[in-house]
Regions:
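Hydrophobic transmembrane alpha-helices that form the core helical bundles
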Residues: 110-111, 129-209, 213-217, 222, ...
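Helix-loop-helix connectors at the membrane interface of multi-pass transporters/channels
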Residues: 8, 68-74, 78-82, 148-152, ...
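Helix-loop-helix junctions that connect adjacent transmembrane segments
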Residues: 76, 83, 114-118, 193-200, ...
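Structural signal for membrane-spanning alpha-helices in multi-pass inner-membrane proteins
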Residues: 132, 187, 212-216, 242-246, ...
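Membrane-interface "cap" regions at the ends of multi-pass membrane proteins
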Residues: 1-21, 26-33, 37-136, 140, ...
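Hydrophobic alpha-helical transmembrane segments
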Residues: 93, 118-122, 160, 202-207, ...
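TM-loop-TM module centered on a large, flexible mid-protein loop between adjacent transmembrane helices
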Residues: 147-150, 155, 187-192, 308-375, ...
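Hydrophobic alpha-helical transmembrane segments in multi-pass membrane proteins
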Residues: 95, 120, 124, 170, ...
Length: 454
């Protein structure tokens, strides 16, 4: 792209943002094959903030909205002047919430009662908030996600390592998350034991993952709608329902299954095991950076992305802390399972209040929320991997994009890998243990990515 320095700064910055966006028509030509009639901008190769070498926030962050008054839509998808459909603050925030917050972990934390508050807040202060702030700062200055951020500091190869670590961690995580969906769906049909059937779990993983891939292949606007709507009804609504149940439980004087003394606010200290517990909760907040690749899908990234991150941070803490306490108040610790613990917790509440019909309904909503998290994670890391692939670090076949400008050259092989991993539930009797080991290994690799990011 030729840069005419006589343009107003805001126009140049806008052009830079469009050029850096993977979905932009201007980005379809690799810098290495740019037309010789147009001088190549050295910043596109040297690793400046964007292809013009001008900070992306120099003009774009100060621009007004389409109405000339800086109005920002926050509840509906909008279109910019070029007719391109844009994300909104609420959509991106919801995608981030469903990518990070998982209802599956609530029962395990409920076992610690009031101490779970501190066990959530410490990792939030030392990891979640710093990660959110770093992601907001980097995303509004350097477009492209983790790959671009690390590349700016350490070069292309280390940048590729960072995005690969993020991507491979997710490839292993997809079957685990969809297995949780399979268990929730078994409660929908009143067959909770079906979740132990390897063939059933593998079939659900394969079908739902490829369905998620088809959604992602249709383009950013569709997956944003699916992710935000499913996240609302499948993550926020069940979390709020647990909070309501917990309040009612206390208000009517039902027996509380955990200690409410002030001393219970401090988790028991058992040496190194307590440190491991806090670290594991740190990893529960991983993913705040994954949707930074969609910053360019906002009308005004410099203003809207930090707002989306701030909103997502507040919602994540809401989804995790208060529902965990509600479960701790009402559900005996011995009944808290791991994979199906959240379903058992809701069944305890519904059966107690004579609403047994609610268990399959809420299990379906939880499955939708988990499905939304899969959709949210499919698009982010693979899109960042595409940015690395286009520098020549991956074969041309993996750089292929479809008519919707989505990275099908990466998503299709990714789906094949997930399909093979899903078959392990059938082939290996202790498939859950094998997958847990793989996830632990992938998470350790993910920590290296965060070290590079910070």
């Amino acid at each position: 792209m030729t840069v005419h320095m006589k343009k107003p700064l805001a126009v140049v910055a806008h052009d830079a943002s469009a050029a850096a966006h993977p979905g932009s028509a201007r980005s379809t030509t690799n810098a290495a094959t740019a037309p010789t009639t147009t001088p190549r901008n050295p910043s596109a190769v040297a690793g400046n903030r964007n292809r013009t070498g001008i900070p992306a926030h120099a003009g774009a962050n100060r621009g007004n909205g389409a109405d000339g008054h800086g109005a920002i839509a926050s509840t509906a998808t909008v279109a910019n002047k070029t007719g391109k459909t844009m994300m909104t603050v609420s959509q991106l925030a919801m995608l981030t919430v469903v990518a990070v917050a998982s209802l599956r972990s609530l029962p395990a934390m409920a076992d610690y009662g009031l101490a779970s508050i501190l066990l959530y807040l410490i990792p939030a202060v030392v990891f979640l908030v710093p990660t959110a702030l770093v992601a907001a700062e980097l995303a509004t200055g350097w477009k492209g996600g983790v790959y671009v951020w690390v590349r700016e500091a350490f070069g292309n190869r280390i940048g590729f390592l960072a995005i690969w670590l993020q991507w491979i961690q997710n490839v292993v995580w997809y079957p685990i998350q969809i297995a949780f969906i399979a268990v929730s769906l078994s409660y929908v049909f009143g067959m909770g034991g079906l979740g132990n059937n390897g063939v059933y779990v593998a079939a659900v993983i394969i079908v739902l993952y490829w369905a998620s891939t088809m959604v992602a292949l249709r383009g950013g606007n569709l997956f944003a709608k699916v992710g935000s709507i499913s996240g609302l009804i499948g993550t926020l609504f069940p979390a709020l329902l647990l909070i309501v149940f917990g309040i009612i439980w206390l208000a009517i004087g039902k027996p509380v299954q955990t200690s409410l003394h002030a001393s219970a606010l401090l988790p028991p200290w058992t040496g190194i095991a307590s440190i491991v517990l806090i670290v594991s909760n740190v990893l529960a907040y991983a993913g705040m950076e994954v949707n930074a690749v969609h910053a360019n899908d906002l009308e005004h990234p410099g203003r809207q992305f930090p707002r989306a991150i701030a909103l997502a941070t507040a919602l994540i803490l809401l989804v995790l802390v208060l529902p965990t306490l509600a479960i701790a108040f009402a559900v005996p610790h011995r009944e808290l399972g791991l994979i199906d613990g959240i379903n058992l917790a809701f069944r305890e509440f519904f059966d107690h209040f004579g609403m047994g019909w609610g268990t399959p309904v809420i299990s379906l909503l939880i499955a939708l929320g988990a499905f939304a998290s899969v959709v949210a994670w499919i698009a982010g890391p693979s899109r960042g991997l595409l940015a690395a692939a286009r520098t020549g670090l991956m074969p041309p076949a993996l750089q292929k994009r479809n008519a919707h400008d989505v990275q099908e050259g990466i998503l299709i092989p990714q789906g094949i890998i997930v399909t093979v991993l899903a078959l392990l539930f059938v082939l290996i009797p202790n498939g859950n243990t094998a997958f847990a080991t793989l996830v632990d290994m992938a998470t350790a690799l993910y920590l290296v990515m965060y070290m590079l990011m910070f």
